[in-house]
UniProtKB/Swiss-Prot annotation:
Species in which this protein is naturally found: Cyanidium caldarium (Red alga)
Binding locations of K(+): 113, 161-162, 164
Record's protein name: Pyruvate dehydrogenase E1 component subunit beta
GO CC list: chloroplast
Catalytic activity: N(6)-[(R)-lipoyl]-L-lysyl-[protein] + pyruvate + H(+) = N(6)-[(R)-S(8)-acetyldihydrolipoyl]-L-lysyl-[protein] + CO2
Cofactors, names only: thiamine diphosphate
Enzyme Commission code: 1.2.4.1
Pfam families, alphabetized: Transket_pyr, Transketolase_C
GO molecular function, one term: metal ion binding
Amino acid sequence: MSMMFLYEALRAAIDEEMGKDSNVFIVGEDVGHYGGSYKVTKDLHVKYGDLRVLDAPIAENSFTGMAIGAAMTGLRPIVEGMNMGFMLLAFNQISNNLSMLQYTSGGNFNIPVVIRGPGGIGKQLAAEHSQRLESCFQSIPGLQIVACSTAYNAKGLLKSAIIEKKPILFLEHVLLYNLKGFVPDEEYYLPLDKAEVVRSGSDVTIVTYSRMRYHVLAAVEKLVLNGQDPEIIDLISLKPLDLHTISKSIKKTHKIVIVEECAQTGGIAAELISLINTYLYDELDSPAVRLSSKDVPIPYNGNLEKSTLIQPDQIVDVVTNLLQYKT
């Protein structure tokens, strides 16, 4: 086992897959000589050359479209968005080409493209650099969405995404790049469609993903001191949702709280609650609860920014009240 930063685990995943398959290449703004905005691709251009670690102009629609065309010829592009908010400029390419071409070509083309890069609410990065776009992209048919949260799952998930035949949107939280964790020295892959049970418990199911995993863990420390026994599930796969793992937990706890960073309207929690009400309603002893960011642009001011996000103490209060709910 080696201790590494999350961004180093991502780099290791890309390096290993590029070393195994000459069809894998990465394209994006400053991915080459600069090494990427968060140094995920640092020095890869030295090892693999400027054609496989390709610096692109500031034109997300252009280099995303190029990557889709490259995938149609048999290559395996990794597209780095310098910031996920900028990938809105490629929304046409993602929604009308990337996700649909396998279907519209009658299965003649696979489109093995990974779109990855930093997103989420950072530290005073202001509105345009603090986009939470999982709720936008989840409505696109044919696009799978994965959110990493540890150095371990970042590497294993990205390696699996790179060898997939279908397009993957791979979400990396801007505040998790410097998170450290142990990563196995031997090669490994992780399933892209499975949630992780982070902590087993019997009182209530708390479902979360990405950075909010750590807000939930902080809240659970306090809940445990109060004699409560929550189960924590990290979704990892935001589309499709791993309803099997969630179902097993709900049938044990009969209560669920969903904690997310994306805005409440049309968020991941909204979709999950819809599925729970359809398939697991009779298993619940109380209504499903969601804790989401406020439906506002993210302020630059630090105090205002913090006020838009769900904080650990809010999770503690909601879970405590939920456990007192009487049917």
